[in-house]
Amino acid sequence: MASDAFMQTACPADAAEQLEAEHAEWAQLGCGAVPPPPAAASRPSRAAVAAYVGEVVDRMRAQSRADERVYVKCGQLVHLRVRARSVPLDDWLTSAELALVSEVAEPVRANRAFVEVSLRYFELTEYATLRALGLQSALKYEEMYLAKLEGGAIESMGQFFVRIAATAATWTMREPAFGRALVGEGATWCAVFNAYLTALYRQLVVPATPIMLFAGRARGSLASCYLLNPQVSSSTEAVEAITTEVARILLNRGGIGISFQSFDRAVSRDCKRGIMGALKLLDSMAMAINSDSERPTGICVYLEPWHCDVRAVLNMRGLLARDESTRCDNLFSCLWVPDLLFDRYLAHLEGREGVVWTLFDDRASHLSRLHGPAFTAEYERLEREGLGVETVPVQDLAFLIVRSIVMTGSPFVMFKDACNRHYHMDTAGDALTGSNLCTEIVQRASPDAHGVCNLASVNLPRCVREGEGGALAFDFAALSTAAATAAIFVNAMMLGGQYPTEKAARGVARHRSLGIGFQGLHTLLLELGMDMLSPAARRLNVEIAERLLLAVMATSATLCEYGCAPFEDFARSKFARGLMPFDGYEGVVLSLPRAWARLREKVARHGLYNAQFVALMPTVSSSQVTEGSEGFSPVFTNMFSKVTMSGELLRPNLPLMRALRKHFTREASRLGAVRALDREQWSVAAALGDLAPGHPLAKFKTAFEYDQERLIDLCADRAPFVDQSQSMSLFVTEPMDGKVPASQIMNLLVYAYKKGLKTGLYYCKIRKATNNGVFTGGDLVCSGCHL
């Protein structure tokens, strides 16, 4: 059907009627400027309704700055536009553009009556909550996640959830233990489908972006993160790895972390450009593949800081690039830092003179396989024997690292020894070599098998219930149920997923690594009336992480109890010796010691189906559909503003806006507070003055207003219960002179190192002193682990 023909057909009657009802509600908000919609009695066309919604949203969304109700109403209108463009279930099932695979379409047809009842229930009940989330949520669904069909049609919200739930249910039924663990004995497709559907449309479980885009469809990979360690040592080997493995993963929209540490030949007659020639090819490939994609992905190159080309990599982006032949603006880098570098930097800070750092070439390649005391001993032996290619004062290298971070947004920083120390396998003599694009996945990658992680997150603000006296309280039972559901859901997606390369499929089969995280921590705390750094918030932060790990690990053990084989290396893992992830940390106090004791016994008897469990990823995209804060980070502004081709897009911090309305009972006072906030870049403290700690508005701080060391403390507090890692970003405000002191960033990295974290820095977000702009040295947009 031609696009014009479909859009000129009559809009569904219920959408046109709802549009008239919405117009009456606009009037109640005092928005007399909203034009009347096409009359429902005239059966307006889909195109007319879509055009009307676009006109009203464009006209009214600027008022979201002062009235959160307008923001919500604009979102509800966008959902009506989605309804106007939707098609019946039969057309959806047979859409060539959607391309549902038969394994998913056939169970939906076979259980059509149940599916239709489920859809109807969603539309009559839960959809109202989802429609009321806000404009950003509605636009993100419409523009990115809802599949585009023929003739300008789009899948409905209900069909979107059905597609994902049906895919998960179909593959769950292929493994009896999955269904039994999810819904009990005698699991049926309908029961499993309903469990997933409910968790999805209530936004308790939020899948990763690849799953939302490609679940049930004949294209795309469902995995989020790929870790590669091709162990290349020449340009020829690098080109082969890039054009085979890397290209195929990028074409499937996977985010990549790739270790090039083994390519450590110094510039010579035989190797004229060192590693940079290979990185330039990688950069060009990333640009070419992303250039025609609405959903770009990315690549992060991992190196250890003793690599002979580390200076070149630190200078490959932005203003630091010497010329176009070395510019790699489409790549990110991450330093895989051994403890020795920070120990030497600390010695320099303590006054020791002449502390140096030595760079090595391929004569020291074996250092990448060592960590801890073994690395230190061998590194210092190589120094004594004079095998280094360059020696630099350690403070000079630290300055180069921080300068690159501030000016280009890269490198990220991860701590090699912490990652190896807390890994579930013994890595002595065979150390881990890198992480993924977003620094939260810690897995082994080898020349014959990639590390692969499949992700989902639990939406913490949905785990809230009314307690005694109507006060809100966190529902730990809801968290545990959501985490267990997410674990089985991701396992099902792994079972049914298609992988871009054989090495990726081999890595999945070998490790079955889960990456279950959470999002909306800051939003949750605000709803519960807590400042993010209050003692109560710190306790809740740890208990959430503990319950999440417990639920996911217990589910994995249950799968083995019900007949699944443990992951391939279980017998050689620390788990087989009775150890848990938190046992590698000192001073851990468990809130549920008996539950953990029972789990230890269960693991000893049955094993674990998965090798890894929890990873706290950035949730940039999915936090937009839930209208919550990203991952575990505080909001970085109380009024997000982005200028696009279609105008300014605003996203207010809804808990703050509602608190303002509740606190300022007179409309004039509320609007005065809003104007003051607008003048002060939406800083509550700057606009309203110093508020008492118990004041209902005092807790609405942004990430830039928090002490960054205290935010690092929150990460360290929950680290024992995060067996992979956390994408920890830092938020720094530029001084009035426009110069961020290098020592400020380096001191935060040292603090993270001393706290024993695995990820020392993902992004360093810098707020300009003169305006509310945020500079990150380059915007990474990833459809993989960014969720």
UniProtKB/Swiss-Prot annotation:
E.C. number: 1.17.4.1
Domain of life: Viruses
Coiled-coil residues: none
Enzyme class, UniProt record, top EC level: oxidoreductase
Site (Interacts with thioredoxin/glutaredoxin) location in chain: 782, 785
UniProt cross-references to InterPro entries, sorted A to Z: HSV_RIR1, NrdE_NrdA_C, RNR_lg_C, RNR_lsu_N, Rrm1
Keyword ATP-binding applies: yes
An example molecular function term from Gene Ontology annotations: ribonucleoside-diphosphate reductase activity, thioredoxin disulfide as acceptor
Site (Important for hydrogen atom transfer): 225, 453
GO biological processes: deoxyribonucleotide biosynthetic process; DNA replication; release from viral latency
Record's catalysed reaction(s): a 2'-deoxyribonucleoside 5'-diphosphate + [thioredoxin]-disulfide + H2O = a ribonucleoside 5'-diphosphate + [thioredoxin]-dithiol
Record site: Important for electron transfer: 762-763
Active site positions, chain numbering: 436 (proton acceptor), 438 (cysteine radical intermediate), 440 (proton acceptor)
Record-listed substrate binding positions: 209, 224-225, 255, 436-440, 618-622
Disulphide linkage map: 225-453
This protein's UniProt keywords: ATP-binding, Disulfide bond, DNA replication, Early protein, Nucleotide-binding, Oxidoreductase, Viral latency, Viral reactivation from latency
Keyword Cell cycle: no
Function: Ribonucleoside-diphosphate reductase holoenzyme provides the precursors necessary for viral DNA synthesis. Allows virus growth in non-dividing cells, as well as reactivation from latency in infected hosts. Catalyzes the biosynthesis of deoxyribonucleotides from the corresponding ribonucleotides.
HAMAP family: HSV_RIR1
Oligomer status and interactors: Heterotetramer composed of a homodimer of the large subunit (R1) and a homodimer of the small subunit (R2). Larger multisubunit protein complex are also active, composed of (R1)n(R2)n.
Similarity comment: Belongs to the ribonucleoside diphosphate reductase large chain family.
Protein name listed in UniProt: Ribonucleoside-diphosphate reductase large subunit
Organism: Bovine herpesvirus 1.1 (strain Cooper) (BoHV-1)
Gene: RIR1
